[in-house]
Amino acid sequence: MASGSKASVPADSFRTISPDRRGEKSASAVSGDTAAATTLKGTAIPVRSVVASPRPVKGKAGRETARLRLQRLPAAQAEDTGEAAAAAAEEPLLPVPEDEEEAQPLPPVCVSRMRGMWRDEKVSLYCDEVLQDCKAEDADEVMGKYLSEKLKLKDKWLGVWKTNPSVFFVKYEEASIPFVGILVEVTCEPYQDSSSRFKVTVSVAEPFSSNIANIPRDLVDEILEELEHSVPLLEVYPVEGQDTDIHVIALALEVVRFFYDFLWRDWDDEESCENYTALIEERINLWCDIQDGTIPGPIAQRFKKTLEKYKNKRVELIEYQSNIKEDPSAAEAVECWKKYYEIVMLCGLLKMWEDLRLRVHGPFFPRILRRRKGKREFGKTITHIVAKMMTTEMIKDLSSDTLLQQHGDLDLALDNCYSGDTVIIFPGEYQAANLALLTDDIIIKGVGKREEIMITSEPSRDSFVVSKADNVKLMHLSLIQQGTVDGIVVVESGHMTLENCILKCEGTGVCVLTGAALTITDSEITGAQGAGVELYPGSIAILERNEIHHCNNLRTSNSSKSTLGGVNMKVLPAPKLKMTNNHIYSNKGYGVSILQPMEQFFIVAEEALNKRASSGDKKDDKMLFKVMQNLNLEMNNNKIEANVKGDIRIVTS
């Protein structure tokens, strides 16, 4: 637990790379994003004191008894909880020797130039300059040669060795020690074989500097001695203030880190691939789509977690196999197969992400596996009242022959619904996992002001409201998205109506998938990370008297890459859209964007320009009019204003 302010560190701060392809040699390192995050402003990395138990090191008297705890600052020590106090009782805190000076703060490392590269620059760097026409099985050798050529520029330089805390400590709080950083002097020597290609010789530089103020100098010396002063090269980050050659080396290291972090897959050299650089380009495009928001943040998080889980599972399997001394027992063989098939499953998911045709929408498979119930056997419909207590006042507007059923929560009400039923919700705040499983034709409506009937998503779930019912209607409600990764509302098939609703998005907006239909009237959509309403090829939507605003709230360094805003249409086959009396404003992309493949765009554009346009500035308007005709897009009396990129635009892909 840190005593000072905590640095912001991503959840995937540590990675496991396998530079020898099949994972025979694996090394842990801190991700490039973490390194950049700590030095982006060009200041020294904050130094802090922590509580941790040093790892016992062999070969020196007294090391086995060196399991003392590093002393924390007194102020933070006074804030210990009962749990921490119990831990301290088991193993008392021992102070660092008084004559031992605290480590100095680490100097800033070279800021990553990779972060500022455009998509085309990254593709050119990896495909044309580094990998060229190499095959997947040769990628390791090519990356090694590229790095060794750059390292010839300078044989000695200063860097920060950033490694997993487990190298130094057996006990530590992960939140307080994201990595252990030590200022070292690096000596570059030509590698003798493939196993030493990603290793480098280091020694502690003066003055002794670390991100952990009270780490003992002796402990660092002992760890390095045990490692024979050889550490993974990709764990070393050159520091600022050296000559220009160091910046070339720093970029080369970042290029190789990014390759193993994001572009390399362990299965690459196990499968035939005619054009490996084309595959690398596709992965670069995937990464850029995540960064610029084409793939919304919450959905991108799913991919990152899947990739991280795949890497971890692969390392687990390698470690498990290496611990089997002789012929495996039946139980060990079963466990190996279990771990192997987990890896195969994750591998399949990652391949789906890399295929543009398969990653059209988040999870790649239907979200609803529940079958339709249909109507009740006796043919009657029931009105479900959702309220903790029910009074006669609540049902005074219902006819005397209405069959009623009262429920304490919305989930239970939805679980008891059959086609034709109505769910009435009174003011309050609700959650319902069953909203993501709408298969029957029901009406869900609030009674009272729509702002007072709040339905929030469960952050632990992927989806919020998902429907494949033939005809489902939501009325007079507020849907508030919290943490779910899919669209706030996803219409998989059938028809959904949203009437007088407020949709406060946190992930993507309303998604209408191929073949589905949506009608939205008198509603408000705001806060989506992508478009407020997204129409997939072959879908149908009618929007009337709605407000769609402040969508495409993406944190991206390249805002010009993100065009989505109020309404986005994906064509081929063309969706159908009718918009009447809507107000679309203050979106960061366009008010309405039409996403059309490049070849089809030029066909339509050429026809529009040759046949419909007269001259001058009218060409763009005529072309847009022609495209809108071809797309079956009808727009009447809409107010589209104050959108950052413009009102309406054809975007090519």
Curated annotation (Swiss-Prot):
- List the SUPFAM superfamilies hit by this protein, alphabetically: Pectin lyase-like
Q: Does the keyword Protease apply?
A: no
Tissue specificity comment:
Expressed in spermatocytes and elongating spermatids inside the seminiferous tubules (at protein level). Testis-specific.
Could you tell me which residues carry Phosphoserine?
Answer: S8, S53
Q: Which residues form a coiled coil?
A: 299-326
Q: Which domain of life does this protein belong to? A: Eukaryota
What Gene Ontology cellular component terms go with this record? cytoplasm; meiotic spindle
UniProt-listed Gene3D superfamilies: Single-stranded right-handed beta-helix, Pectin lyase-like
Q: Which residues form the PbH1 repeats? A: 493-514, 515-537, 538-571, 574-596
BP GO annotations: cell differentiation; male meiosis cytokinesis; positive regulation of chromosome organization; spermatogenesis
TM segments?
none
Q: Which SMART domains match?
A: CASH, PbH1
Localization: Cytoplasm, Cytoskeleton, Spindle
UniProt keyword list: Acetylation, Coiled coil, Cytoplasm, Cytoskeleton, Differentiation, Phosphoprotein, Repeat, Spermatogenesis
Which residues fall in a compositionally biased region of kind Polar residues?
A: 28-41
Regions of biased composition (Low complexity) lie at 46-56
Q: List residues, modification N6-acetyllysine.
A: K570, K645
Q: Where is this region: Disordered?
A: 1-65
Function statement: Testis-specific spindle-associated factor that plays a role in spermatogenesis. In association with HSPA2, participates in the maintenance of spindle integrity during meiosis in male germ cells.
- What interactions and quaternary structure are annotated? Interacts with HSPA2; this interaction may promote the recruitment of HSPA2 to the spindle.
Q: What is this protein's record name?
A: Testicular spindle-associated protein SHCBP1L
Q: What is the lineage of its organism?
A: Eukaryota, Metazoa, Chordata, Craniata, Vertebrata
Name of the gene: SHCBP1L
